[in-house]
């Protein structure tokens, strides 16, 4: 068939709080769901949700988290970009004016994607409300922003705190090695 049948719903909520004359706290929540039906088992790849990257959980590379507890291995499915049918993302960021149009930022991000159905490569990605909070990837970090008026140039250094899959470590901070828990992003 030349087309895929699916319904995609997504919402975005942003709230700003002025903390000081030059400091602002920004809260952001983004959630979405895709339901494929008819001739499509999955929505087209470019419509699917993903987590990680400059506009998501900045401690991780783009499409490197999820779905659910899925962790790629050296199996025949290790090439799969990690996308899902359900997305939940939340960010909290403090922005402080440094000088002129230059701002510093401190952020905390959390999120993941899930599938609505089991897939042949993994059943660990299917959404389960009882495991929701344990399956959120969490990261923190710092950044620099330069406000050009029409757009903002930014660089963020993210540090992973928690991944949703089993790493052999217990607790909130379950990253095996600190050097594997960092990501640098440039965005406009």
Name each region found by the language model.
Residues 122-148:
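Strand-loop-strand
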Residues 15-17, 94-96, 146-148, 159, ...:
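Residue-level signature of outer-membrane beta-barrel architecture
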């Amino acid at each position: 068939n030349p087309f895929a049948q699916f319904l995609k719903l997504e919402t975005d909520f942003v709230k700003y709080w002025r903390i000081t004359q030059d400091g602002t706290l920004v809260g952001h929540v983004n959630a979405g769901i895709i339901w494929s039906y008819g001739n499509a088992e999955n929505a087209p790849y470019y419509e699917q949700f993903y987590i990680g990257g400059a506009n998501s959980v900045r401690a991780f590379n783009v499409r490197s988290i999820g779905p659910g507890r899925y962790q790629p291995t050296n199996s025949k499915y290790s090439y799969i970009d990690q996308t899902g049918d359900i997305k939940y993302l939340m960010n909290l960021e403090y922005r402080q004016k440094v000088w002129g149009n230059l701002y510093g930022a401190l952020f905390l991000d959390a999120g993941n994607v899930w599938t609505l159905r089991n897939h042949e490569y993994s059943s660990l990605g299917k959404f389960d409300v009882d495991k929701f909070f344990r399956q959120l990837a969490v990261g923190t970090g710092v950044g620099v922003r330069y406000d050009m008026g029409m757009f903002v140039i930014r660089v963020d250094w993210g540090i992973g705190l928690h991944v949703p899959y089993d790493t052999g470590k217990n607790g909130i901070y379950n990253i095996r090695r600190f050097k594997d828990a960092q990501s640098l992003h440039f965005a406009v």
